[in-house]
Amino acid sequence: MSRRGIPVGRLSRYLAAGVAALALLGGGLTATAQADDRGEQFLPPKGAKVVSPKNMSPKIIGGTNTSFSSAPWMVQLLFEYDNDGLFYFTCGGTLVAPNKVMTAAHCVTDANGKALDMVGRGMVLAGTAKLAGGPNDEGTAVGITRSYFAGTYNADAIDNDIALLTLSKPLSYTPAQPASYGDTARYQPGTVATTYGWGMTGSDWDFSPLSDTLLRLEQPLRSDAECSENLDTAVNVPGAYKPGHMICAGIGGTGNDTTGKATCPGDSGSPMFVSGRVIGITSWGPASDFEACNIQGTYDAYTKVATYYRSIQPRIDDTSFSRDHRADLFARTTGATGYTMNSTGEALAARKAFAGSYSAYNLIIQTDLNRDGYEDLIARQSSTGDVYWLHRSASSSTYAKTKIFSGWKTVRAIVAPGDVNNDGKGDILAVTSTGDLMVYPSYGNGKFNTAVKAATGYQVYNQVRGHGDFTYDGKNDLLLRRGGTDDLYLAKGTGKSTAPFETPVKVRSNWSAYNLLVTPGDVNGDAKSDLVARSTTGDLYLLKGTGQGTSEIFATQVKLGTGWNSYYTIG
């Protein structure tokens, strides 16, 4: 088994030809684009040939040209191998939030599965259909701050081949949404799926060029039984194809580039779509010493995105004040000063004063409403009940104040649970004075669609909280404490726009020992939402989420601090 680009063995990752064999190949082409005024050059893979449509019949193999406007979520991964300012194309990827890119794990690891230094030497290029930006330096390039692997990537088996990159700045291009956990409709055998990429336009290892423009390819999905029989036989490795972790597609390689339809080296990390959702990531396929792809009778393998959705979704929406993957706390005393307390996992760092005055607000919760990687605040003004979105941008650390709702003085609860209707944008919930649970679907820019009544009877709950997924199914949930009994209830998310929550079920009894529940998100960084609770004596506790929607929903509490009764607002 080998990384695509080194023709050894019969199982190959679909990396760009030449990238993994730097010691064997030399030189680079001169197509460049500039970013951040640092003088970087963006180039196709070292030693790789590039062909333009005027010199070829456009194809991945059997594909067609596509414009950036029809695939605005498509990005390129670049890597600086020699600390010389030259960043070479390695893989494709998908923008799944303004500051998040989904790709293949083998695109951000070496041949042994060791993570590459994508933070120090990697970059993402977006906004162009041209390979490495083309001769006119098209596109926008941004750095990378974090890499996340959903599952344990197995380099030998090319298993769990999915990664998520966090960008240093948000991009303004339209993101795509991954297929949800449990989605079966989009994976039916025979369904026609569309794949994108800049990969090789022929199957010959030595003479086939990469495309200089983005291409698309339609292929029928195959059943797991077909995939296992076809691919295990093709690579002579029983169990090479792993149902549940992988899918496969294709008409069956023809061995002839004029009649074949296949993904090839250079297409790695790029998305496969069905009905507007990313269902797969180009991963691997059979190869020989002479043929890089389109092997007679064989299919192409892709990572099954829906399987990993519940792991990657908490990382797509993991914005915090410290800009790591752990949720922090915001609090203020009876004065005007706000403070942030950054999570260190199972403890909180010393508080830091947060710019601005907050004495005018009687409710403050945190969220990233526009998914730009900078934490926002939702704050209700005491005197008027008006609700404001306090947000900053990549170009300014000053928080702007935007009114988003008026006259919410009698609203019982305001919640920012994240995306509840499965459209990729963080929403706002409100419990009215009469107990109606209202969902305000967000456009992601401080504006909202018409409110939807999701439930009634919520006046019986004295606290309504939620941020993220407490049941590890990829859907955001709510926690409710009932007045009188102080029992804790869970309302599981459904991901449906008309009925986004199930009927609440009791998960804990008599929580009267706590006078405040806070749901900032994933505090300890394990991709499961947690709960922070303040006791009546002022002690603050972390209750780590377990992902179970039962009485075992939280692990044993861990004390975070004392004296928290001095804080007026915690969010």
Language model regions located:
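Protease-domain processing segments flanking chymotrypsin-fold serine proteases, especially trypsin-like
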Residues: S2-A97, M102, L116, A292-I295, ...
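Chymotrypsin/trypsin-fold serine protease catalytic domain
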Residues: K130-G133, A141-G143, D156-G255
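Conserved H-D interstitial segment of serine endopeptidase catalytic domains
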Residues: L78-E80, V101-A104, T109-T152
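C-terminal subregion of chymotrypsin/trypsin-like serine protease catalytic domains
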Residues: T32-G39, L95-V108, L210, L215-D224, ...
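Structural detector of coil-to-beta-strand junctions
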Residues: P72-Q76, T90-G92, I247, T263, ...
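Extracellular/periplasmic catalytic domains that process cell-envelope and extracellular macromolecules
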Residues: T66-S70, L95-V96, L116-M118, A155-D159, ...
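Trp/Gly-enriched beta-strand/coil motifs that build multi-repeat beta-propeller-like domains
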Residues: D317-G571
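Acidic glycine-/aspartate-rich tracts in secreted/extracellular proteins
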Residues: E80-D82, H106-T109, G127-A132, S168-Y173, ...
